[in-house]
Amino acid sequence: MAAFRIFGISLLVTVAALVVGYAHGGVNDLFLLLVLAALEVSLSFDNAIINAAILKQMSRFWRQMFLTIGILIAVFGMRLLFPLLIVWATAGIDPVRAMELALHPPAHGALEFPDGSPSYEKLILAAHPQIAAFGGTFLLTLFLEFIVYDRDIKWLKWIEAPFARIGRLGQVSVVMVVAALVLAATHLTHSGNERATVLTAGLLGLVTYLVVNGLSRALRPPDVDTVTAGKAVGMAGLTLFFYLEVLDAAFSFDGVTGAFALTSDPIVIALGLGLVGSMFVRSITIFLVQQEALDRYVYLEHGAHWAIGALAVIMLLSIEQRFEIPEAVTASVGVVFIGAAFGWSVLRNRRSTRVSAPGP
């Protein structure tokens, strides 16, 4: 019953989105919408686990904000407005004109119009190296910050223990991210201009993570369980909310760019990735929090971070088109890590139960 209450709204939103999708483009858009929603959920399950780890520290008010205002930001901000802003920043085409290009693409799926001008899809694909550098760097920093922290519970001890020792040096994760970014920009770009834009985008991704994460740590109360109300609590909740939205943005880059392999229609992308997909990801997040899944299955958060690390590497490699990996493979990697972490957690719980069980 609890699961139905959590996912019921997502199901209602899905039905409404399917009706709008069918009215917009018939059966074809209906099918694309469902495929994009499945793509978003499969790519973002690790995102849901990380969200749950943060959301359990937030008050009921900020959880509601995440499910209401947050979903509006996900739909209209990241899945609809973000691609338009990318076209504006990289090609100098204002968002209104970019929307016109998106809604009226060339015939037969061509990447150019008869006069030789680029389509909306081509403009987005041309900006992929910068998008991949920003998102990949942000997520790689998130992964390394988790791995180099010396925590009591370790999953892949043979890797995590050495990284935790290295982490004592301080800011080692930043050094490793910068090194990875320089390697990617040096070996995966084809011109000085492209190298400069990739480096700039990657450094912006790193700075964004450091600023947002730094603010969330500075404003987070020492004991979140005692949080009730007041200015400090409000600022702490607001910062964590902002952190979740930036995190969602970084995760959405791969889905948004991957969606163009299926369609360049911004309405279908916003409905499939944003409305249906993001709503289900948020429902999964709430379900994990209410079921206390991260406390019961202690390796889940580790598996999610390893999945994030894999996604970050895949995004950075995709700066070079030859190394672009299909979204189905990307999603499968995340599922494997999270599935393995869940299985290890179950085995750990069984061993703990046997050890604590009274003897005959």
Language model regions located:
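Multi-pass alpha-helical transmembrane bundle typical of ion/small-solute transporters
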Residues: 1-360
